[in-house]
Curated annotation (Swiss-Prot):
Binding residue positions for Mn(2+) 1: 110, 131, 135, 214
Residues annotated to bind Mn(2+) 2: 131, 133, 214, 216
Lineage: Archaea, Methanobacteriati, Methanobacteriota, Methanomada group, Methanobacteria
Cofactor(s) of this protein: Mn(2+)
Protein name (record): Uncharacterized 32.2 kDa protein in hmfB 3'region
An example molecular function term from Gene Ontology annotations: agmatinase activity
InterPro entries reported in the protein's UniProt record: Agmatinase-rel (IPR005925), Ureohydrolase (IPR006035), Ureohydrolase_dom_sf (IPR023696), Ureohydrolase_Mn_BS (IPR020855)
GO biological process: putrescine biosynthetic process from arginine, via agmatine
Keywords: Hydrolase, Manganese, Metal-binding
Family recorded in the similarity comment: Belongs to the arginase family.
Length: 285
């Protein structure tokens, strides 16, 4: 395979890690439903590249990286074919789960999250959705499966709860839908203006959690290289504080999506890698 995530272990080491929480990392270089800025197919590579910019020690947590992560490479995608790409995603995630690993998936556009979460029994799972957009359209550009419809399709899988964090863009129909279905959301202004209140509300939630992070949840000043940049976003500090709370609880999977750049050093890729490291440092093993 090509470039691996920094500090990741060889797959052959899995047999020696049976007593530890192990993360299996997969890339999904798919962006065929992108509608504004394509390029998230380069996201897995750019996040891996950015991972080498960080130390394996956290000054904040006063600890070395002690959670094993095994980079399993990229899933085969068929550009222009969501259905078969989604099938490939689900099959690979099932393999990761059968090996007792927790999946971390790097996109790619946000539609790929559907292929990941449909492998789980979601009846007791809370989906934590960090995003600038609600992604609750029933159809978008004539398609039922799209980066703009992904959370609507996930809602139809009947998770215990969906909580949307950092949203600031939607259609009238999407807003009416989340209100009618009692889907909880916190806007970016809620977070900026009432951060401690929102943080406490998130801390009260029960896991297990599946966490999906569209990097455009960050303000474009921190993450310009995304598929749909939207001003008045949250900051990396807000993300770090959310992760501190979330990582104390049971997490069944994580994805980070919509890094849309092919430029080494792009802040979107750097922040995506930092978010992943924050989870790995904060999670208890």
């Amino acid at each position: 395979m090509g470039l691996k995530f920094a500090y990741s272990k060889d797959p052959s080491s899995l047999k020696y890690l049976s007593n530890k929480k192990v993360f299996g990392l997969l890339g999904v270089p798919f962006d065929s439903t992108s509608t504004y800025k394509p390029g998230s197919r380069f996201g897995p590579l750019m996040i891996r590249q950015a991972s080498y910019n960080f130390e394996n020690y956290s000054l904040h947590y006063r600890k070395k990286l002690d959670v094993p992560i095994i980079d399993l490479g990229d899933i085969e995608v068929i550009l222009g074919d969501f259905k078969n790409t989604c099938r490939n995603i689900s099959e690979k995630v099932q393999e990761v789960l059968k090996k007792g690993m927790i999946p971390i998936v790097l996109g790619g556009e946000h539609s790929i999250t559907y292929g990941v979460v449909k492998t789980f029994d979601l009846s007791d799972v809370t989906i934590l959705h960090f995003d600038a957009h609600m992604d609750m359209a029933n159809t978008y550009a004539g398609k039922k499966f799209s980066h703009a419809t992904v959370m609507r399709r996930i809602y139809e899988l009947h998770p215990k709860k969906i909580v949307q964090i950092g949203v600031r863009s939607c259609t009238k129909e999407e807003h009416e839908f989340v209100l009618n279905e009692n889907i909880k959301y916190y806007t970016s202004r809620d977070i900026i203006e009432k951060f401690n209140m929102v943080l406490n509300e998130i801390n009260k939630l029960d896991g297990p959690f599946y966490v999906t992070v569209d990097i455009d949840v960050l303000d474009p000043g921190y993450a310009p290289g995304v598929g749909n940049p939207t001003p008045v976003g949250i900051t990396p500090y807000h993300m770090e504080k959310f992760i501190e709370k979330i990582a104390r609880k049971k997490i069944i999977g994580i994805d980070i999506v919509e890094v849309a750049t092919d430029r080494i050093g792009d802040p979107a890729a750097m922040n995506a890698a930092k978010i992943l490291y924050d989870f790995l440092f904060a999670i208890k093993i």
